[in-house]
C-alpha cells in the first residue's frame, strides 16, 4: 500500500513539473517579390516568385526579437485572376490554367477551396529563413493580377503568429487594376489598400 501511495505522489509531482504553455500571439513582417519586374511578357516567358521570412523576427506587438523556428502551418495562398471590366463579365475568373508552375523551394499545390484561382504554398524552414520559391510560365494571353495572402495562422506549440507579407517590387504595374476599379465599378472606385501592397500585375501578349 505504501508503495502505491508513493507512486501516486511521484506521478502528481512529475505532472506538476511540466512547462506552462503560454498562448502567445505574435505579429511579424516579411516581404515577397516577383521578377523580372516587367509589365508585359510573351507567352512562354517565365516569372519567378520568392519570399523569405526570418526565423528570428521582430514581433510587432512587443517589439522583441522572437525565435520562431520549428513552427507548423507556415503556409498561405496566392491568388491568380484575370483582370477584366467587371461590368462586362458575370464574375472574376481565376487564372490558374493560364500558367504552368514549377516549385523550387517549399511546396506548391492546388487550393481545394479555390482550384481555378488560387494556389496553396508552404515554406521550407532553413537555419535563417523560411523560404518559398517557384516559377510560373505564361500559357495564355491576357492581363493578370497575382495577390499574395498574409500568413494568418502559423503555430509553434501554444504560440500563434500572423505574418504580414508585402511586395517589395518597386513597380507592381497596378495601372492595370484601373480596368477593375473605377468610378461606378461594382468593386469600388479606387484600388483597395490591401491590393496596393499585396498585388502584382502584368500583361501576357
Residue ranges and their predicted role:
Residues 2-9:
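Sec-dependent signal peptide recognition
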Residues 13-16:
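C-terminal motif of bacterial Sec signal peptides marking the signal peptidase cleavage site
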Residues 18-77:
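Start-of-domain marker
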Residues 33-37, 114-120, 130-133, 185-187, ...:
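Short structured motifs
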Residues 39-45, 137-144:
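A short, structured loop/turn motif at beta-sheet edges
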Residues 50-54, 79, 147-149, 203:
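Residue-level recognition of well-ordered beta-strand positions that form the cores
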Residues 57-142:
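Structured domain cores in non-transmembrane regions
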Residues 133-134, 144-205:
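Glycine-rich, aromatic-bearing surface loops/beta-hairpins
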Amino acid at each position: 500500500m505504501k508503495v502505491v501511495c508513493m507512486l501516486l505522489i511521484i506521478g502528481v509531482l512529475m505532472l506538476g513539473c511540466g512547462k506552462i504553455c503560454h498562448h502567445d500571439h505574435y505579429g511579424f513582417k516579411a516581404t515577397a517579390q516577383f521578377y523580372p519586374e516587367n509589365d508585359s511578357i510573351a507567352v512562354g516567358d517565365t516569372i519567378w516568385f520568392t519570399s523569405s521570412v526570418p526565423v528570428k523576427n521582430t514581433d510587432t506587438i512587443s517589439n522583441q526579437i522572437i525565435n520562431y523556428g520549428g513552427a507548423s502551418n507556415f503556409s498561405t495562398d496566392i491568388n491568380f485572376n484575370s483582370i477584366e471590366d467587371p461590368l462586362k463579365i458575370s464574375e472574376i475568373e481565376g487564372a490558374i490554367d493560364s500558367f504552368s508552375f514549377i516549385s523550387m523551394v517549399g511546396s506548391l499545390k492546388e487550393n481545394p477551396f479555390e482550384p481555378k484561382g488560387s494556389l496553396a504554398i508552404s515554406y521550407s524552414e532553413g537555419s535563417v529563413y523560411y523560404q518559398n520559391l517557384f516559377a510560373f510560365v505564361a500559357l495564355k494571353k491576357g492581363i493578370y493580377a497575382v495577390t499574395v495572402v498574409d500568413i494568418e495562422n502559423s503555430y509553434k506549440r501554444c504560440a500563434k503568429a500572423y505574418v504580414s507579407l508585402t511586395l517589395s517590387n518597386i513597380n507592381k504595374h497596378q495601372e492595370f487594376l484601373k480596368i477593375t476599379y473605377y468610378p461606378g465599378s461594382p468593386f469600388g472606385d479606387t484600388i483597395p489598400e490591401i491590393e496596393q501592397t499585396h498585388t502584382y500585375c502584368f500583361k501576357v501578349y
